[in-house]
Each structure stands twice: as structure tokens, then as C-alpha cells.
Amino acid sequence: MQNISDKKNAPLQEEVERAVEVLRRGGIILYPTDTVWGIGCDATNAEAVDRIYRLKRSENKKSMLVLCASADMVVRYVNRAPGIAFEVMEMATTPLTASLPGAAGVAPNLIPAEGTLGVRIPDHEFCRRMLRALGRPVVSTSANISGQPTAVGLQDVAQEIVDGVDFVVNPRFEGKPTRKASSIIAFGEGGEVKIIRE
């Protein structure tokens, strides 16, 4: 099913509702974030997560992060995150992914052996509304075949990816992304901090 948004003048909330409907059915979407365009699905749906791995031809499974609407949502899906992680996320002035211990409640095929979950709270209107409406985290992985260059804008996304998703969000809701991957900081249960990517 090709489901590219064809409603050029659809209001933001209508586009959010269309994306959420696809996510609730177990579909995957191509959508703008605060960094680069991403492929996403309901992070609690293991079949949808597996579809993304197959679409990206990813051999390095269990490396995708999730977007959450708020810190309140984060704590529902990680049960051993130290308080400092939330302080750092709140103070961040650029997109930051926090690798947090104690992943719980998401699809098992998202959780690596060490039990962590990469989480970002996006500063992006479309994403925030979508996450609030869905009420669950959404997978966010770069919209490219593994090993290929990151697709910064929709125009950079390979046709294979576009054809492989169930819905493509209208690019006019892109906002002002940074056009580069987020920083990544890993937090230990005891508050240890390790910068993975600046």
C-alpha cells in the first residue's frame, strides 16, 4: 500500500492523526524529526520493529532509539534511569539521545543484551503531537539502507525506503531540523556518564 500524504494543505493535527492511525495498525512511517528524516513504528510492536530492520537491511539489530513525548513517558519504559539523565536531557540545547538502563515495556527486539534503551524527547511540533496522540514511544531510525549515507531531507530518501513504508508525512511539517544525528550520552544506574557521540 502506498500511503504518501497527498493532502498538501492538510492541517498539522490531521496529518498527526493519519500517522497515528497507521502506527496503531502496526504500520511503519517515514517522518520528519528534530534531526533528520526517520523511519518509525510503535515501539511496543515487535512485528513492526522487525519490518524496519528488514527495510533497512540492518544486521546490527537492537540499535534503534525511540522518541518519547516527555520525561513522564520515558519513565514508563525505562525503570532504572538515574535522575541525572533527566536533568541532562532537560538542560540540553541540541538534540540528545540518552542511553538508559532498565528498558521495559518496549518490543523485545529493540532491547540489546545490556538491557538499555536509547531515548530522545524531540523538540519538534509534529513529533510531540504524534507521540502524545499515540501515547507510546515511536521508533526513530535514520531513513536509509544500513551502510548508506543518512538521508537528511525527504529528497535524499531512497525510493526503496519510500516504497517500503505505509505512510510518508508531508514534508511541509519538517520544521527546522538540525540535519545531523543527535548527540548520544550513556547513563549508568549509579549516575555514571559516558559520551558516545558528541
Positions of predicted regions on the chain:
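Active-site-adjacent structural elements in enzyme catalytic cores
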Residues: 1-198
